[in-house]
Structures are given as structure tokens and as C-alpha cells.
């Protein structure tokens, strides 16, 4: 530890400095070392591993985290390659997955192998749009209806106000909802290759000022939870948020039997009774086996917002036993991804995006984020097929035992 880091830690413990004030005293690396020193002294923890990180401390402190103390590392594996024909992604892809769940990468890898043996999966982004829904206070429902009508009649003016804050985002629609003396306006934006949450928030604040200037409505909060961000929500399942993407594949029966030791009919029954009926009985918004596993692992590997796995797991898996084949699909209703900004600028996350060939802005704009969404959807499909097959063949517990997990 540098002497100055130790001295700074002394000052923190003496009450002369707060942890967040260390950034004003020195560079980010030294400030992080000082924070680790404070933690070691006050908790008796060993923080050597926290201090062994590969990213640039100054960049991380400026853009990613406050009170930078170190780095958290996760094992990263790759599944694939998996063949994919999409609207933006086309070819064979290795899927980088950061996880601590043993057997997950092996599970997805097995599904990828079957998909590729079948000639590859199809994938399409069918809807895009990051949303933000401010809530306004009005006198009563009559006034609320008038504000909602004003919003419907003045979409162009709202777009001009919102788009004045960004050179990339475009307002695509505004949907009003009136609940008593509350008016919610759900703004939807095309944020191109950015995940776009910050962009949408800043743009919506500007549009909300126009609403207040032109109507009796008073802004209470720029987010009224009808967006809906980082929470399970039916509106995201129905209307979508981020990217709505579907992947599907038809796998010949002989491939199913050879690779999974089961039949298309058995996999279909497992899906119907588990993912559809079981999920309905549970009141689940996710009618799938474990789509969140793949979404979370790829999100961590590629620098996405990990909390938005909540929306990403909003998925429906369908399976049909067709003539001598298995048809399977996964629809992810609200997958929020980006290939620019945020965590995508960190070095290991940049490399993972490079493995997929989608780092940075796409040509046309939005193409790289679309491609990432399609790749994740195919990865989720691979995971769904393999887990359902393992359940149908009663091999799930044996697979975990074989891998020592």
C-alpha cells in the first residue's frame, strides 16, 4: 500500500476526511487503496483480491461507481458456437457468460450444440423503445382527462422538447394513463445502441416541463413506476421495454434423441406442465424455465445493468412436437441492452462485446444493440431447450452431480 494511502486512511479514521472526500485528495487508485486500508483496519478483512483489478480506476470512479474500493471478479466461460440468423446478427457466435453457477455454461453449451446441428436458430427484434413514465398531480379525473387529451394532441411538441436534450434519442410515442387525480405519461424512446435509461430520463424531464407550462398538471416524480424499471411488471410483458426479441428453432427428432436422450413429445409435455401451467398456477410473469440465468450471465460479461435482469427474465417459452421434429421458441418481452456507454466501456466487458462483434455503435444506429439482443435470445433458447430436455429425461440432478456442483 502506498504511504499516502495509509496516511489518508489515518485521516479518515481520525474523522478529518469522509470516504467520498478521498477522491478530492488524490488519484482514484490511491483513494481506492486508502478505502481498502480503512476496511482492513475496521473489519479485519483481507482486501488483497479486491485490489487486483484490471480496469482504469480513474475512468471507473468518473463513470461507474462512487467510493471506488476495488473490483469484484467472476469466472467467465463461453458457450457455443451457436449458429444464428437474425435481423441484425448473422453467423456463429461464442456466448460469453460470467457466472458462479456450476453447470450453467455446460447446459447452455449443450443447447447451442443442438441448435447448430439443426442448422441454427432464427431471431428477430420486433419492438424497441426505452420508456419513462412521469406521474403528474391534477385536481380530479376531469382535469386528468384534459391533460391526457392534451398529450395526445401535442406529441410533436413533446418530442421537440424531449429531443432537444439528446443528439441520438427519438421520442416514438406517449401513452397517457389516468388514475383518479394522477396522470401518468409513458414516454417511449428509440435510444439506438444505448440502453438509454439516462437518456430517457433527461429527455422526459424536459418534456415534463412543457406539460407543466401548458396544462394544470404538476410533476410529482419523473418516474411514476409505470415505466417500469427494475421491477416485475405486466406492462413490460405486454407493451415491452428496451427490446422485444424472439428466437426459435426447429430441431430434427434424431438430433433431439441423440443429444438429449429424450423425445420432442416429452420435452413439449415438460414445457406445458412446467412453464405454462405451473407458471400460471404460481401467478408468475415469467413462463420459462431459467431464462434469467442466461440473461444475467451475459449481462455481467458484457457490462449491462445487472438489475435489469428483472425485466429480461420476462420471457415465454413455447415448445411443440411437430412432424419428426421439435419446435421451440423464447420471447423476451423487455430485454434492456446497450453496446455503448455505462459498463460497456470497462475493459473485460469491452472484450466480451468484441467476442460477439457488437462493441460500440452499429451501422445503422441501433444495429449492434439489436444484434446483442438476438444473441442473448438464442442463448436463452439454448438454455431452455437443454433444461427442459434434462427434466424430460430425468437427467437434471445427474448432470449437476456429474459436474460436481
From Swiss-Prot:
Pathway the protein takes part in: Metabolic intermediate biosynthesis; (R)-mevalonate biosynthesis; (R)-mevalonate from acetyl-CoA: step 3/3
Subunit structure: Homodimer.
Compartments where located: Cytoplasm
Family matches, as CDD domains: HMG-CoA_reductase_classI
The protein's name in its UniProt record: 3-hydroxy-3-methylglutaryl-coenzyme A reductase
Record organism: Halobacterium salinarum (strain ATCC 29341 / DSM 671 / R1)
InterPro entries registered for this protein in UniProt: HMG_CoA_Rdtase, HMG_CoA_Rdtase_cat_sf, HMG_CoA_Rdtase_CS, HMG_CoA_Rdtase_eu_arc, HMG_CoA_Rdtase_NAD(P)-bd_sf, HMG_CoA_Rdtase_sub-bd_dom_sf
Regulation: Is competitively inhibited by lovastatin (formerly called mevinolin). Lovastatin also blocks the growth of H.salinarum, and this effect is reversed by addition of mevalonate, indicating the critical role that the mevalonate pathway plays in isoprenoid biosynthesis by these archaea.
Amino acid at each position: 500500500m502506498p504511504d499516502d494511502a495509509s496516511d489518508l486512511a489515518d485521516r479518515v479514521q481520525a474523522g478529518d476526511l469522509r470516504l467520498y472526500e478521498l477522491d478530492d485528495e488524490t488519484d482514484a487508485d490511491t483513494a481506492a487503496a486508502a478505502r481498502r486500508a480503512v476496511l482492513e483496519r475496521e473489519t479485519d478483512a483481507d482486501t488483497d483480491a479486491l485490489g487486483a483489478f484490471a480496469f482504469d480506476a480513474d475512468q471507473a470512479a468518473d463513470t461507474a461507481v462512487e467510493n471506488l474500493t476495488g473490483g469484484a471478479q467472476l469466472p467467465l466461460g463461453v458457450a457455443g458456437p451457436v449458429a444464428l440468423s437474425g435481423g441484425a446478427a448473422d453467423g456463429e457466435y461464442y456466448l460469453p457468460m460470467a457466472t458462479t453457477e456450476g453447470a450453467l455454461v455446460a447446459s447452455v453449451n449443450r443447447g447451442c450444440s443442438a441448435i447448430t446441428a439443426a442448422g441454427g436458430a432464427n431471431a428477430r427484434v420486433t419492438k424497441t423503445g426505452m420508456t419513462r413514465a412521469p406521474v403528474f398531480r391534477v385536481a380530479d379525473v376531469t382535469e386528468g382527462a384534459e391533460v391526457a387529451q392534451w398529450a395526445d394532441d401535442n406529441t410533436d411538441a413533446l418530442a421537440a422538447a424531449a429531443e432537444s436534450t439528446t443528439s441520438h434519442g427519438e421520442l416514438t410515442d406517449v401513452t397517457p394513463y389516468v388514475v383518479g387525480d394522477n396522470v401518468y405519461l409513458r414516454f417511449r424512446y428509440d435510444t439506438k445502441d444505448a440502453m438509454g435509461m439516462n437518456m430517457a430520463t433527461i429527455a422526459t424531464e424536459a418534456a415534463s416541463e412543457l406539460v407543466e407550462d401548458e396544462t394544470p398538471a404538476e410533476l410529482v416524480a419523473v418516474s411514476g413506476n409505470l415505466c417500469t424499471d427494475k421491477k416485475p411488471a405486466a406492462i413490460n410483458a405486454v407493451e415491452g421495454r428496451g427490446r422485444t426479441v424472439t428466437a426459435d428453432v426447429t430441431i430434427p427428432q434424431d438430433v433431439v434423441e441423440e443429444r438429449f436422450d429424450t423425445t420432442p413429445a416429452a420435452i413439449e409435455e415438460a414445457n406445458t406442465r412446467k412453464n405454462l401451467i405451473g407458471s400460471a398456477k404460481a401467478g408468475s410473469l415469467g413462463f420459462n424455465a431459467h431464462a434469467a440465468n442466461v440473461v444475467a450471465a451475459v449481462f455481467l460479461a458484457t457490462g449491462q445493468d445487472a438489475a435489469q435482469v428483472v425485466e429480461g427474465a420476462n420471457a415465454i417459452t413455447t415448445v411443440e412436437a411437430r412432424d419428426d421434429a421439435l419446435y421451440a421458441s423464447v420471447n423476451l418481452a423487455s430485454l434492456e441492452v446497450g453496446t455503448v456507454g455505462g459498463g460497456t466501456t470497462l475493459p473485460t466487458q469491452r472484450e466480451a462485446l468484441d467476442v460477439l462483434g457488437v462493441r460500440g455503435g452499429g451501422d445503422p444506429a441501433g444495429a449492434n444493440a439489436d444484434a446483442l439482443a438476438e444473441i442473448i435470445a438464442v442463448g436463452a433458447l439454448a438454455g431452455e431447450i437443454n433444461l427442459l430436455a434434462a427434466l424430460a429425461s430425468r437427467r437434471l440432478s445427474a448432470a449437476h452431480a456429474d459436474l460436481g456442483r
